[in-house]
A protein has these predicted regions:
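A generic structural signal for well-ordered coil/turn residues at beta-strand boundaries
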Residues: 61-63, 92-94, 120-122
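Mobile, glycine-enriched helix-loop/loop "lid" segments at the mouths of ligand-binding/catalytic clefts
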Residues: 88-102
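Structural motif of enzymes handling amino- and sulfur-group chemistry
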Residues: 1-65, 71, 75, 81
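Conserved hydrophobic/aromatic beta-strand scaffold that supports enzyme active sites
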Residues: 5, 64-66, 97, 125-127
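A common structural junction motif
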Residues: 82-92, 143-145
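PLP-dependent enzyme catalytic core of the Aspartate aminotransferase-like
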Residues: 73, 80, 98-145
Length: 145
């Protein structure tokens, strides 16, 4: 049974990855326009310094990216109040996930190491799943009110 389920998952992986890539890029573009965001780091965006390299190396751009909120308080408020975005879970699921890397995945890094790799306490890592983008946008906006 497990092998059968894995086979089914693999057979639709390309379609799911393309859908996730498209949604992630749209969400990142929307985030770039928001006044509560300082910077969005997504390799599919024209603003990314290594966009050409990413397009050359990857057939599908992953749905995981980072955004720096204008303040730590705003980033934390979003994480605490979001209803749709799941927190502290592994990325790559069908559901959208978020984390503050300086507190979770990179918590063992020093402030200097975090700064060197472009992560601040207001950086939020997003993994966009298959939810409706309108719902995700509304969830974020409602969470930071």
């Amino acid at each position: 049974l497990d092998v059968h389920l894995i086979s089914l998952g693999i057979s639709s992986l390309k379609v799911r990855m393309k859908a996730s890539e498209k949604a992630s890029k749209k969400f990142a573009k929307w985030l770039e326009k928001q006044d509560f965001i300082k910077k969005v780091t997504h390799p599919a965006l024209k603003s990314h310094p290594q966009r050409a390299l990413a397009k050359k190396q990857m057939k599908i751009i992953p749905s995981v990216f980072c955004a720096d909120f204008k303040s730590v308080e705003l980033a934390e408020k979003f994480i605490e109040n979001a209803k749709i975005f799941g927190e502290k879970c592994s990325f790559g699921s069908a559901d959208s996930r978020v984390e503050i890397p300086s507190k979770i995945s990179h918590a063992s890094f020093s402030k200097e190491e975090l700064k060197a790799i472009g992560i601040s306490d207001s950086t939020v890592r997003f993994s966009i799943g298959f939810e409706d983008l309108k719902d995700l946008k509304e969830d974020l906006l409602e969470a930071i009110k």
